[in-house]
């Protein structure tokens, strides 16, 4: 029973010959190079680009064995590598089905007039040319503006230089006589101060007169400004005589000589 069941084929199973015939033949997988070649052929057929150069015709498939590999294989006596299916020669014209698909593709591209990808490729150079013209025009405008700005800046600098020259050529404003007199008074006071300071500088701390006591305040000279009495020839500090450095009199009498002069004492020095 088992032999009969195993030997007999079920009516539902199709025969083996039909299975082998129904399966389609295995096709070679498409690559990026095949797609690029197809696109270039379509564009060349439509007249958008020139036909491929001779270098593309001399293209060799990547599956071909290089001479270095053949030398290595001959040296090592290795068995021949398995031969891969060689792609069809690009110089051969495509089949009728491919031509029909290409024609339909080109007709669709022409009918759309700008919606397809090929129309973009066609309009690309034109649009790029217009954009280039627009960019050139904008650059020219910018250059003109820049030149105008430079000229304006040059004129501004020239005007500034002219203004400075005019300001330098104008005479200085004349001050009123009161201001000049005040300046003169200040100059005389400054001269007196410089004289007193010169006298102070002339006496150093190591000098013998530094510790000399001549004033009625019984304090040493110590480099402070002093004035001499015209009668008794006594040196008195300006601070003790209540005299400012800016207003030093030419003739000075100390307090003692003033009192003696009022009571009919000796005549002052230099008087008859």
From Swiss-Prot:
Gene: phf23-a
GO biological process, one term: positive regulation of protein ubiquitination
Record note on domains: The PHD-type zinc-finger domain is required for negative regulation of autophagy.
Cellular localization per UniProt: Nucleus; Cytoplasm
Keywords: Autophagy, Cytoplasm, Metal-binding, Nucleus, Zinc, Zinc-finger
Gene Ontology CC terms: cytoplasm; nucleus
SUPFAM superfamilies: FYVE/PHD zinc finger
Region of interest: Disordered: 1-31, 50-193
Domain of life: Eukaryota
GO function terms (MF aspect): zinc ion binding
Reported function: Acts as a negative regulator of autophagy.
Zinc fingers (PHD-type) by residue: 212-260
Family per similarity comment: Belongs to the PHF23 family.
Biased amino acid composition, Pro residues: 79-93
Bias (Basic residues): 136-148
Record's protein name: PHD finger protein 23A
Main location class: nucleus
Pfam families membership: PHD (PF00628)
